[in-house]
Amino acid sequence: MRTIENSLLVFNQGEDEQPGRHEGVSVAPEKPALKRPARYRVVLLNDDYTPMDFVVDVLMKFFAMNEEKATQVMLLVHTQGKAVCGVYTRDIAETKAAQVNQYSSECEHPLLCEIERAD
């Protein structure tokens, strides 16, 4: 004998007409379509005082980059004035930017990080 698992249909043997029930079969309500959350870029800004090694350290520590990738992003910050460190949902982007700004301040560097909407 076979068993039915995860069935969405329920058979009704009663004769009562109830909303949502047709011919002895109950129809599961449709799940609402979920909207993807907005995405935000975390952007590191260049300054003339923060050492390049510190920027690489920040990228490795807060954005889980390896040394090679962190160096590439640091050079983009240095040559273009800013670079994207990652794209996240708003809460995560705000948290990462705040962590970088706090860490930089504690280490007495003027390095700044901000977020901007990506989509």
UniProtKB/Swiss-Prot annotation:
Gene3D superfamilies: 3.30.1390.10. Disulfide bonds: none annotated. InterPro entries: ClpS, ClpS_core, Ribosomal_bL12_C/ClpS-like. One of its GO terms (biological process) is proteolysis. SUPFAM superfamilies: ClpS-like. NCBIfam families: PRK00033.1-2, PRK00033.1-5. Involved in the modulation of the specificity of the ClpAP-mediated ATP-dependent protein degradation. Binds to the N-terminal domain of the chaperone ClpA. Belongs to the ClpS family. This is ATP-dependent Clp protease adapter protein ClpS. It comes from Marinobacter nauticus (strain ATCC 700491 / DSM 11845 / VT8).
